[in-house]
């Protein structure tokens, strides 16, 4: 007779207490999902976005975070966007935070292994957060940018750009040139 192990589903709070060491994981509907490492190209584009945001947002009250900062998207889901921007978390009381639940903008750098989840599951989770105004997907293989922006209660506009375009983020009052996102130096 076969034995089936049944594991209890985790809450976001329980998940955040687990030390995964060098490994990365997300919590998806109470289930731990291990994450693979990225490529050099992925890391470069992620770094370019973070740097562009950090330089433009300094002194604005908004702070960009890399993928070390967790976003609590639901009581049973924790995500680690490639880059996220939060407002109002710049006080000393937030210095030891490991997760926030109110990003204003979220960036996901797509890879073959994550694109399906990023473009479906995570998009829905991010859109459900009242604080999120802008979700940006970066397709590094094709140098495409997809910008999903809130237009009001329940309204969203979704634009994809195949040609180089400036990435405007009205909620943050900044623009990032396409060339800066994909820069190799």
Q: Where are the model-predicted features located?
A:
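Gly/Pro/Ser/Thr-rich low-complexity, intrinsically disordered segments predominantly at protein N-termini
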Residues: 1-185
């Amino acid at each position: 007779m076969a034995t089936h192990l049944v594991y209890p589903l985790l809450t976001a709070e329980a998940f955040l207490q687990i030390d995964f060491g060098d490994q990365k994981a997300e919590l998806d509907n109470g289930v731990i999902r291990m994450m693979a490492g990225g490529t050099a190209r992925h890391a470069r584009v992620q770094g370019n976005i973070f740097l562009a945001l950090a330089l433009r947002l300094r002194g604005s009250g908004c702070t960009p975070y890399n993928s070390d900062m967790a976003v609590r998207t639901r009581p049973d889901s924790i995500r680690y966007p490639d880059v996220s921007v939060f407002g109002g978390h710049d006080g000393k009381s937030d210095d030891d935070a490991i997760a926030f639940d109110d990003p204003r903008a979220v960036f996901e750098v797509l890879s073959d292994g994550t694109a399906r989840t990023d473009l479906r599951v995570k998009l829905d989770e991010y859109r459900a957060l009242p604080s999120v105004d802008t979700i940006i997907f970066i397709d590094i293989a094709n140098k495409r940018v997809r910008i999903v922006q809130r237009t009001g209660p329940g309204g969203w506009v979704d634009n994809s750009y195949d040609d180089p375009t400036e990435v405007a983020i009205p909620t943050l009052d900044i623009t990032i040139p396409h060339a800066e996102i994909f820069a190799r130096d």
